Design a protein with these regions (language model features):
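A membrane-interface helix-boundary motif in multi-pass transporters
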Residues: 108-126
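A late C-terminal transmembrane helix in Major Facilitator Superfamily
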Residues: 81-113
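Helix-loop junctions at membrane interfaces in 12-TM secondary transporters
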Residues: 46-56
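Multi-pass alpha-helical transporter architecture, strongest
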Residues: 71, 121-146
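Structural signature of the two symmetry-related core transmembrane helices
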Residues: 28-42
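Residue-level signature of mid-helix packing/kink "hotspots" within the transmembrane helices
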Residues: 7-15, 96-100
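Intracellular juxtamembrane helix-capping segments at the cytosolic ends
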Residues: 66-79
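Helix-to-loop junctions at the C-terminal end of transmembrane segments
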Residues: 13-25, 110-111
Length: 146
């Protein structure tokens, strides 16, 4: 049932994000993409009621909705559309690798006896670092057009 909140928030975000991209550009929205995911990890860390799964998955749905649209439009804004196929192929390959690596890493943490709260804390640190990095380089995300 909690996956319904993921689906609902993901679809709503897809609809709203399309409008926001047209209004503000992908490059400006990119830095905010992982903030809901970061908040979701905080939900896991600080709350343990079963109902928090709805909130967590809703926040993940928001980040995923943003990622689905920003994944293509940002590259097109920065590099143009001439090489978008090659760029998407590379980023998809990296995503598949990261998914496999992340699964193995989380499995390692679980086997090592880490609680879900500790794993979420480690993830929150990594996400916070990525958000901070994006805020740091946001003015350098200018079009390159090869």
């Amino acid at each position: 049932q909690s996956f319904m909140s993921y689906s609902i928030f993901s679809v709503i975000t897809l609809i709203v994000a399309g409008y926001l991209i047209d209004k503000f550009t992908s490059r400006k929205l990119l830095i905010y993409m992982n903030i809901p995911l970061f908040l979701g990890t905080l939900v896991i860390i600080y709350f343990d009621a079963p109902q928090t799964a709805f909130l967590f998955l809703g926040l993940v749905g928001i980040s995923n909705g943003l990622a689905n649209l920003l994944g293509s439009s940002t590259w097109a804004e920065i590099y143009g559309v001439k090489y978008i196929g090659s760029i998407k192929a590379l980023t998809t390959a990296l995503m598949v690798f990261a998914t496999a690596f992340g699964t193995a890493l989380f499995g390692f943490f679980i086997d090592a006896g880490f609680s879900i709260e500790k794993i979420a804390f480690i993830a929150a640190i990594a996400i916070a670092c990525s958000i901070a990095l994006l805020f740091t380089i946001r003015k350098k995300l200018n079009p390159v057009y090869l």
